């Protein structure tokens, strides 16, 4: 709505409607939508939700889950290397496509299936598991293989994010398990849904007119957007929505 009010046009109206339906993830070129709305990521998430029964079927047992993960990874590689060619119109295929990000969802499912074993290993081998995750994280940035192409980026990110999930599942480290993270977790959905609106508000201030350094501009923007999103989410959840739900419950 903010985008439509700021830049009113028939194109903005069409794109706003596509965003509201939450089905825009099925559009082959929805990554070019200029009305940011809830963002491309939520488009992928809702495609995943619609396919969730099939995902549960694939994750029914460990053998099927591993086969599904391998097949999805191979299909993603083929999509990035073959179906993006001139033969198929040279249409860009990236993380806006559910087939490309399917390995991420399935790797998360695999981590869930092995959560007991993961917790046992990480808790008993805290130092070793911490070192392994740290080494993988450092290698990702020190040896940026992902710069070689989309396939390399896909494979390295799947490995990196999977290692983070594995360590997070089993750790009781105060860095991740504390009052701050629990508080942010309680309003994480509200933060996600509102952060682009806050970004639009920050964008209107035109900080770039006053801050010329790109790195500093990025840091300031992140702080303002995250701080604004947290404040907005807190007010909405613990004050406004709380009053609305209490009013509705009084009518029962």
Show the residue positions of the predicted features.
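Short juxtamembrane and helix-loop transition motifs at transmembrane-helix boundaries
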Residues: 2-9, 24-34, 84-91, 111-122, ...
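Alpha-helical transmembrane segments of multi-pass integral membrane proteins
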Residues: 105, 133-242
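Hydrophobic alpha-helical segments with transmembrane-like composition
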Residues: 6, 20-82, 232
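Aromatic-anchored segments of alpha-helical transmembrane domains
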Residues: 25-27, 71-84, 132-145, 197
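Membrane-interfacial alpha-helical segments at the cytosolic side of multi-pass membrane proteins
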Residues: 48-60, 107-111, 201-208
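Membrane-interface helix-boundary motifs at transmembrane edges
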Residues: 5-8, 55-66, 113-126, 146-151, ...
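Interfacial loop-to-helix transition and helix-capping segments at the boundaries
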Residues: 30-44, 83-107, 139-164, 191
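Transmembrane alpha-helical segments and their boundary/interface "anchor" motifs
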Residues: 1-22, 46-48, 100, 129-132, ...
């Amino acid at each position: 709505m903010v985008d439509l009010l700021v830049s009113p046009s028939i194109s903005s109206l069409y794109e706003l409607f596509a965003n509201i339906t939450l089905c825009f993830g099925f559009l082959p070129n929805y990554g070019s939508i200029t009305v940011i709305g809830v963002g491309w990521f939520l488009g992928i998430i809702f495609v995943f939700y619609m396919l969730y029964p099939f995902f549960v079927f694939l994750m029914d047992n460990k053998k099927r889950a591993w086969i599904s993960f391998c097949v999805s990874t191979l299909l993603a590689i083929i999509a990035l290397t073959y179906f993006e060619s001139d033969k198929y119109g040279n249409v860009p295929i990236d993380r806006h496509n559910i087939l490309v990000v399917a390995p991420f969802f399935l790797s998360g499912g695999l981590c869930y299936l092995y959560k007991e074993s993961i917790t046992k290993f990480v808790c008993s081998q805290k130092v070793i598991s911490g070192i392994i995750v740290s080494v993988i994280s450092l290698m990702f940035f020190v040896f940026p293989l992902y710069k070689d192409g989309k396939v390399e980026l896909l494979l390295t990110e799947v490995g990196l994010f999977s290692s983070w999930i594995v360590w997070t599942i089993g750790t009781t480290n105060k860095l991740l398990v504390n009052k701050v993270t629990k508080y942010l977790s309680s309003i994480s959905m509200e933060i996600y849904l509102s952060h682009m609106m806050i970004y639009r508000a920050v964008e209107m201030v035109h900080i770039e007119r006053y801050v010329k350094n790109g790195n500093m501009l990025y840091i300031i923007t992140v702080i303002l957007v995250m701080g604004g999103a947290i404040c907005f989410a807190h007010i909405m959840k613990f004050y406004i929505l709380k009053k609305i739900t209490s009013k509705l419950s009084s009518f029962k």
